[in-house]
Amino acid sequence: MRTWLTRGWLARLLWPLAQLHGQAVRLRRALYRSGILESCRFGVPVIVAGNVVAGGAGKTPLVMALVRHLQAQGLQVGVVSRGYGRSSHESLEVSIGTPVAQSGDEPALIKRATNAPVFVAKKRADAVRRLLATYPSTAVVVCDDGLQHYALQRDIEIAVFDDRGVGNGWLLPAGPLREPWPGRRQQGLDLVLHTGLKPAFEGFTSGRQLADHAIAADGSQIALTALRGRTLVALAGIANPEAFFAMLRARGLVLEQTLSLPDHHDFGAGDLAACAGKTVLCTEKDAVKLFGKPGLASLQLLAVPLVFSPEPAFFAALDALLAPLLSQLPSGHGYQTA
């Protein structure tokens, strides 16, 4: 929201509510620290990647990059998530064929992109419990979101920021902050990663750009350059649709129409009724819900992947934090076998 970027009249009007939000956050954190509220710790390292601000900043692409990095080292990695926006509240393992309505779009995307075990549950600690019971040789658990979910203890915390930084620096609803910043939260983070071009404060950086190709529902690829000159429609049901549209235009694509939809949007038949006979570009996150959906046969629906590439120093710092934690695991535990 643009209101969150400045301290205008609306933000000032909401400022008293932000103070109440801040007090509630501090009280909740104190209850967990004192042990009044239970916080679960597990026998393997837990990495939490999330946002201090509301809205997308690249958290899910980071989770996928973390999983791939750890898998490349031979580690068995599992992912847990609350599965925001899903219709079911049960704890379940996400498979390639799990309906997105049951898993949530982000867990479905992570599963398809990494093939790591992915579990969703209303309480993330329950998801970890099921993950470790099903895959006892798991070496590292990566939690998609959950910086503010203190019921799950973690060993490494990573916060992601885009060009908005912390916006106007105020708490919800007057600003974008989910918790006070700076302060104990900034000092307590292990790693900060900036996905924008202009980092607002110290931290590691990551490249974020579109792939050179788009993917059809059957898995075939088409170069973005081959789409120039076509009548194109772009849609995005993500936190910042305009960023996706801007990246498409930067690749030389002319968008006849753009459709900005709410994050985690549940697509209905009417959403794309005006796009019949056209080539429609969407994000991978939207594609997990749209591919195979009835009534879209008249569209050429293409997903454009996002290439997320943190700087090497980020992974070096992560490995340095993780090494002593992995050394405490039983010998050979958590490594993939050939």
Swiss-Prot record:
EC numbers, comma separated: 2.7.1.130
GO BP annotations listed: lipid A biosynthetic process; lipopolysaccharide core region biosynthetic process
Keyword Signal: no
Protein purpose: Transfers the gamma-phosphate of ATP to the 4'-position of a tetraacyldisaccharide 1-phosphate intermediate (termed DS-1-P) to form tetraacyldisaccharide 1,4'-bis-phosphate (lipid IVA).
A GO molecular-function descriptor: ATP binding
Pfam families referenced in this protein's UniProt entry, alphabetically: LpxK (PF02606)
Family in the record: Belongs to the LpxK family.
Lineage: Bacteria, Pseudomonadati, Pseudomonadota, Betaproteobacteria, Burkholderiales
Name of the protein in its database record: Tetraacyldisaccharide 4'-kinase
Annotated positions binding ATP: V53, A54, G55, G56, A57, G58, K59, T60
GO cellular component, one term: plasma membrane
UniProt key word Disulfide bond: no
Cross-referenced NCBIfam families: lpxK
Catalytic activity: a lipid A disaccharide + ATP = a lipid IVA + ADP + H(+)
Pathway recorded for this protein: Glycolipid biosynthesis; lipid IV(A) biosynthesis; lipid IV(A) from (3R)-3-hydroxytetradecanoyl-[acyl-carrier-protein] and UDP-N-acetyl-alpha-D-glucosamine: step 6/6
Domain of life: Bacteria
Gene: lpxK
Keywords assigned by UniProt, alphabetized: ATP-binding, Kinase, Lipid A biosynthesis, Lipid biosynthesis, Lipid metabolism, Nucleotide-binding, Transferase
